[in-house]
Amino acid sequence: MDSDPIVIVSAVRTPIGAMLGALSGLEATDLGAVVIKAAVERAGIAPDQVQEVLMGCVLPAGQGQAPARQATLKAGLPPSTGATTLNKVCGSGMKAVMLAHDLIRAGSQDVVVAGGMESMSNAPYLVPKGRTGYRYGHGTLLDHMAYDGLEDAYSKMPNGGGKSMGLFAEDCANKYHFTREAQDAYALESSRRARTANEDGSFAWETVPVTIPGRKGDVVVERDESPFKVDPSKIPHLRPAFVKDGTVTAATSSSISDGAAALVLMRQSEARKRGLTPVATLVAHATFSREPEWFTVAPVGAIEKVLAKAGWQTASVDLYEINEAFAVVTMAAMKEHGIPHDKVNIHGGAVALGHPIGASGARVLVTLLGALKKTGGRRGVASLCIGGGEATAIAVEMA
């Protein structure tokens, strides 16, 4: 093991807002600023001690130049702080953490903030032929959220977009013979866990309240929105969302959401020099890639790779966070690795909480750290699937 490993000294996320919900009045850069500021404060360092900020963002259209730079300056960090925006679809926030680790390990930087941010509610529509002009007939609008975030780029449909990610979730369900009933049961449990975690204080360590300015006074958002919009009794009766006789529904798919998450990383020696107590050590990270149409099972490979890098066995890991882009994604990883559900997403996952795509990779890592801290667990693995056939994973060990 590295004698001077990279450690995480703080981790924070916003509550997750529903589509056009509580957080929709803020841009992604506003949400990013909230978590960058909170992560620096919770780390116990001065803003001018951060050398670089890496933030994932999948839907940057309409936000202006360099969203990560905007978020950095809005957070009160000085103009001397470098900032980079990353796009690896749903893995953007986690890849930011992985690259922060590597920057520090290479000696390029000493203190880095890494995470992700997304306001899916504010993703604009695009006019593809607007620059050259529409000479005659009907024009076309493309939904930036769908086209650049939620549709497969390798299988174009007649409407100009790509195949919906949900169609590939149906393929995954068929491959593993996951029934509608099994997926519904998974979603119901995820919803129960997420609601309970919001109510019993399980998320208190990891979340930062978001203040929304308004003419009638500020509104403070302190808990995840979507778990309290769900009527569990309706889940078994929902229509299939993607295929007429399919098994995947809106309840077993992650919801369109807004949110952000960030972590502060440095070497262990740097933390000691500053008198800081790390939250955890980043033991290993991995990327796994395969055919685009099978992104749903890519976390299986990413988890296998990160466990091998860490020198761990599946059973030696106390908790897992495996992003629920669809229930079948997490179910497949659990089945392939023989992981019991009581070790996975113990506070609920994205089918209940929501999936702000640029932020989710960092969000699952922050939530993993919070869950390990609450339960007294030591080892954890966070992973998520990525459109295009990829997945990432990070292994951490609590300090």
Predicted regions, residues:
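Conserved active-site "lid/cap" helical segment
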Residues: 1-63, 67-75, 79-82, 168-180, ...
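Active-site-proximal alpha-helical scaffold in enzymes
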Residues: 86-118, 173-202, 262-269, 334-335, ...
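Active-site pocket-lining segment
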Residues: 168-170, 208, 213-214, 283-352
